[in-house]
Swiss-Prot record:
It comes from the Eukaryota. Keywords: Autophagy, Isopeptide bond, Membrane, Protein transport, Transport, Ubl conjugation. The gene is ATG5. InterPro entries: Atg5, ATG5_HBR, Atg5_HR, ATG5_UblA, Atg5_UblA_dom_sf, ATG5_UblB. It comes from Candida albicans (strain SC5314 / ATCC MYA-2876) (Yeast). This is Autophagy protein 5. Belongs to the ATG5 family. It is found in: Preautophagosomal structure membrane.
């Protein structure tokens, strides 16, 4: 295919893609800021420990490490089990495309009054002994479940990941957290024995609608969007653009979803597509 050359180099660039984020915390009507750069294909809980350490310097009434924190954008809790880049494309990129002067993504950190369990997955595990929230344990459980789901779609069975040795399972998790591309690729190949169908999730910016479906590996991106989002993918809806990993992939409409998945899949082996109306 002409549009996707130098696959390894492109994958490396995607792996190293990052987003500038400004985290705000309102403490007694005083706004405290924290700036960071976070990889697109990582997850927000990986930076929770450093947020807690920083903001604890300004809080004396509570131990932040012992209460679950969460992040919000425009008062909407962020689903932390989604990759950072997917959240960015779905929630923030549409506004940025219309106003290039918006700057970095600004979101708020919360720790009270009540964790919004009706919107986002709660953190129920705690570290033994000191009562601190164990964010990594919960994230491990959720991401491994997502990998099992994608493994089932890809292989027609979840056996490849279920049959990983304990050592390989732990190494896979460490490669996700440390973002070791080499180790991740080696271990991920053990999960993907065959490619039966492609695990795809389609998000529509500005809408709560999410389309999740196993897709035939031979279908094109255009065929998939026409089938699952016909109102946004018809010729009369030419202003709807598909974004993957922050990139407008309109030029790849006639490529097979398998080729696109091989290039753009996330750490959980799902292909996340965001439709943005421009």
């Amino acid at each position: 295919m002409n549009d996707i050359d130098n696959l390894a180099e492109i994958k490396k660039k995607l792996w190293n893609g990052s987003i500038n984020v400004k985290i705000l915390l309102n403490i007694e009507d005083q706004i405290i800021e924290y700036l960071l750069t976070i990889p697109r294909n990582s997850y927000f809980p990986t930076v929770f420990p450093q947020l807690i350490r920083y903001f604890q310097n300004f809080i004396t009434t509570i131990e932040l490490s012992k209460v679950p924190i969460w992040l919000e954008f425009e008062e909407v809790p962020l689903k932390w089990n989604l990759p950072v880049g997917v959240l960015y494309d779905y929630l923030y990129l549409p506004a940025l495309l219309n106003d290039h002067d918006l700057g970095c993504w600004t979101i708020s950190m919360k720790y009270e009054p009540v964790y919004p369990i009706e919107y986002i997955i709660p953190f129920n595990e705690k570290l033994a002994g000191d009562g601190q929230i164990d964010y990594m344990k919960t994230m491990n459980r959720i991401l491994m479940n997502q990998l099992k789901q994608s493994c089932f779609v890809l292989n027609g069975t979840a056996k490849p990941i279920m049959q990983l040795s304990e050592a390989n399972t732990n190494q896979l998790w460490k490669s996700l957290i440390s973002r070791n591309l080499g180790d991740f690729n080696v271990l991920n190949k053990k999960i993907i024995k065959t490619i039966d169908r492609i695990p795809v999730k389609i998000y529509i910016a500005g809408s709560p609608i999410v389309v999740q479906a196993p897709i035939s590996k031979d279908q094109t991106l255009q065929e998939i969007l026409s089938l699952h989002t016909p109102n946004l993918s018809s010729s009369s809806s030419s202003m709807s653009h598909p974004y993957i990993q922050g990139i407008d992939v309109t030029s790849l409409m006639n490529q097979s979803i398998r080729e696109i998945w091989q290039l753009f899949k996330h750490l959980d082996n799902f292909l996340y597509i965001t439709l943005i109306i421009l």
